[in-house]
């Protein structure tokens, strides 16, 4: 047998020198805070790479969007079918301050609403709030049986659907355009707009399961830190200088 270098033995030694670095050792944990319009403020935790050189951790966090169940934010299982989007606008210490970014229904809830023998009516409205947030609201409604109705189906005529849709857009426009984004959020949680639509369309055709199924944020105004801190119930730091009143004494030179 020829004596020579055994290639198989030398191959195994290369991997021993490599050290595996845990990627989580370079990351920091930040708390995500929801606005004060919701009952539960602590949304959860998020990870980000630590600030190194020109890469700032705060810049990586700003703009992150979190999708949270409204049931967790309100501590109420009745809101489990609605999802709220929260966007990180500011980082203070280890806290990420978020703002409302949108609302949506779970797909299983939407599928459960659509049934036979009834008409589905949808409407969408683009509206601007008083604090210059441009939103698009999508509403959904279904017809229901009139009292003492024997007929199985509850199909509405085209003229009735148009009248209901017109009423829906008017109510959404009125309710959303007359308030700020935070005030609109407080209206969306208990479904004030849906109940208002249901009540006002009784004369045209009785409705059921009337919801604002989706809210889409199209455009935000220029970022205002003071407004965000007020939304989170935190006092703003006063950066303006105070007027200092001091007696002015003119120095007189005795010798020139």
UniProtKB/Swiss-Prot annotation:
Keyword Phosphoprotein: no
Region spans: Disordered: 1-20
Pfam families listed in its UniProt record: Ribosomal_S3Ae
BP terms from Gene Ontology: translation
InterPro entries named among the record's database cross-references: Ribosomal_eS1, Ribosomal_eS1_CS, Ribosomal_eS1_euk
Sequence ranges of Basic residues compositional bias: 1-18
Major localisation: cytoplasm
SMART domains the record matches: Ribosomal_S3Ae
Keywords, comma-separated and alphabetical: Acetylation, Cytoplasm, Ribonucleoprotein, Ribosomal protein
Name recorded for this polypeptide: Small ribosomal subunit protein eS1
N-acetylalanine: residues bearing it: 2
HAMAP family for the chain: Ribosomal_eS1_euk
MF (Gene Ontology): structural constituent of ribosome
Subcellular location: Cytoplasm
Family classification: Belongs to the eukaryotic ribosomal protein eS1 family.
Subunit structure: Component of the small ribosomal subunit. Mature ribosomes consist of a small (40S) and a large (60S) subunit. The 40S subunit contains about 33 different proteins and 1 molecule of RNA (18S). The 60S subunit contains about 49 different proteins and 3 molecules of RNA (25S, 5.8S and 5S).
GO cellular component term, pick one: cytosolic small ribosomal subunit
């Amino acid at each position: 047998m020829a004596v020579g270098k055994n290639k198989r033995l030398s191959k195994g030694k290369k991997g021993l020198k490599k050290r595996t670095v845990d990627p989580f050792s370079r990351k920091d944990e930040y708390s995500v805070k929801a606005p004060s319009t919701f009952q539960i403020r602590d949304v959860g935790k998020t990870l980000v790479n630590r600030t190194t050189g020109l890469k700032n951790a705060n810049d990586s966090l700003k703009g992150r969007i979190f999708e949270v169940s409204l049931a967790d934010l309100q501590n109420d299982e009745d809101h489990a079918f609605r999802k709220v989007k929260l966007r990180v606008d500011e980082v203070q210490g280890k806290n990420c301050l978020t703002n409302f970014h949108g609302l949506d229904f779970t797909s299983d809830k939407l599928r459960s609403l659509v049934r036979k023998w009834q008409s589905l009516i949808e409407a969408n409205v683009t509206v601007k709030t008083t604090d210059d947030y441009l939103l698009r609201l999508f509403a959904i409604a279904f017809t229901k049986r009139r009292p003492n109705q024997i007929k199985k189906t509850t199909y509405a005529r085209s003229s009735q659907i148009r009248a209901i849709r017109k009423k829906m857009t008017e109510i959404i426009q009125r309710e959303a355009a007359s308030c700020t984004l935070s005030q609109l959020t407080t209206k969306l949680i208990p479904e004030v707009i849906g109940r208002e639509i249901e009540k006002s369309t009784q004369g045209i055709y009785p409705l059921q399961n009337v919801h604002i199924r989706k809210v889409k944020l199209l455009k935000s105004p220029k970022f205002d830190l003071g407004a965000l801190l007020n939304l989170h119930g935190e006092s703003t730091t006063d950066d303006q200088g105070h007027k200092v009143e001091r007696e002015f004494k003119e120095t007189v030179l005795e010798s020139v």
